Design a protein with these regions (language model features):
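N-terminal secretory signal peptides and thylakoid transit peptides that target proteins
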Residues: 1-19
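Residue-level signal for the nucleotide or nucleotide-sugar donor/cofactor binding architecture
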Residues: 6, 92, 116, 279-287
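Rossmann-fold NAD(P)H-dependent dehydrogenase/reductase core
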Residues: 17, 34-257, 266, 338-350, ...
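Generic structural signal for alpha-helix termini and adjacent loop/cap motifs
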Residues: 30, 131, 295-298, 340
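C-terminal helical subdomain
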Residues: 121, 224, 273-313, 323-328
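C-terminal tail/cap regions
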Residues: 298-362
Length: 362
């Protein structure tokens, strides 16, 4: 007997929408359209990372993947390495990163990265910089999803915001010049549909970044994911005219270790949903990251948001295309992280050509 696949929306209706974990909430009333000017791919929500990279040769390319120790981060690293890329994989501990990297067929290097600790972020970035090589692909994949039953604050900032956004904000800043030296650098920010299903109605609450007022874990997670999308939007704007692109994406609902901090009911919701076919496998969940990072169709696409391997525009009051909010987020993030950031100048032609020679000879 063939089991019929239950789509995510039908599953939520059948369950009475009882599962309220971020990113699982039904999107009834949300209108999404294909983004104009971006080539459509033939891939969809059932495509896997191996399928979307079939025939793509990444030999000589350097990729950095944060959160490589499990889930879609591990699968992303595995597939990129399989296609020939040299992958630097990060984990919260060096032992975990080393174990993940050693189990992958291909060239990898493990580095420790704790996104909630900016000193760790700087140390990780400096270790990668010391490799003295261009970076072709930088995938900001690591993330945090809290239990939702209380505010956790780190250095005066709510944990979702500091781990999911600010940590990567510093990380990208410290590695940006290495992407300038690549033939065509790509920054991929793994966000979530929670950016428009769970974020505060007014968008990012800049006056409550410590979560002290009316804290709700789901809203805090959604706010951090909206920050990911706006980070990609602003990066795309600031990098216009360069060879670097930046895009964000929703990987899908996947039963991975990101739910380890949820209560048992919510963890059960993730497991049941994926087992019934309402979610994605890890192989499918890594597909959009790998597609955005490698597709020849997207060489000049920047500042866009992707779902199921295609760029989409979310209509309505989602704030995902709010350029003023994106600019303010950049300014606030810069102020909060000022002591850990470095200033950049765009490399001149001699610098750039030297970087290209190093990239091609690597």
């Amino acid at each position: 007997m063939t089991r019929k696949r239950v789509d995510r929306r039908t599953f939520l209706k059948l369950s009475g929408a009882a599962i309220t974990a971020p990113g699982i909430a039904a999107c009834a009333g949300t209108n999404k359209v294909p983004t104009e000017g971006v080539p459509r791919s033939r891939f969809d929500d059932e495509s896997t990372a191996e399928e979307v990279t079939a025939g793509i040769e990444l030999g000589g390319k350097i990729a950095v993947v944060t959160g490589c120790t499990s889930g879609i981060g591990y699968e992303t690293m595995r597939v990129l390495a399989k296609r020939g890329a040299y992958v630097v994989g990060t984990g919260r501990s060096l032992d975990k990163a080393r174990a993940a990297c050693s189990s992958v067929i291909g060239k990898t290097t493990p580095v420790a990265l704790e996104l909630s600790d900016f000193d760790s972020v700087v140390a990780c970035a400096e270790a990668i910089r010391s490799m003295n090589t261009p970076i072709d692909i930088l995938i900001c994949n690591a993330g945090y999803l809290g239990a939702g039953d209380g505010t956790e604050v780190i250095n005066g900032i709510e944990k979702h915001f500091i781990v999911n956004h600010l940590g990567h904000f510093v990380f990208v800043n410290r590695l940006l010049d290495r992407l300038f030296f690549a033939w065509q650098g790509r920054i991929v920010v793994v966000a979530s549909r929670a950016a428009y299903t769970s974020a505060p109605d007014a968008g990012i609450d800049f006056d409550n970044l410590d979560g002290r007022y009316a804290y709700k874990g789901r809203s805090a997670y959604g706010q951090s994911k909206l920050s990911n999308v706006l980070f990609g939007l602003q990066l795309g704007k600031l990098l216009r005219g360069t060879r670097i692109t930046a895009n964000s994406l929703h990987p899908g609902v996947i039963n991975t270790e990101i739910d380890r901090n949820l209560n048992r009911f919510m963890q059960l919701g993730f497991a049941v949903m994926t087992s019934l076919g309402g979610g994605k496998t890890v192989q499918q969940g890594a597909a959009t990251s790998c597609y955005v990072a490698t597709s020849p169709l997207l060489g000049s696409t920047s500042g866009k948001y992707f779902e199921d391997c295609n760029a989409v525009t979310v209509l309505g009051n989602s704030h995902m295309q709010d350029e003023a909010m994106a600019e303010r987020l950049w300014q606030v993030s810069t102020e909060l992280c000022r002591d850990f950031l470095i200033e950049h100048r765009q490399p001149n032609r001699d610098d750039f050509e030297k970087g290209l020679r190093n990239s091609k000879s690597g």
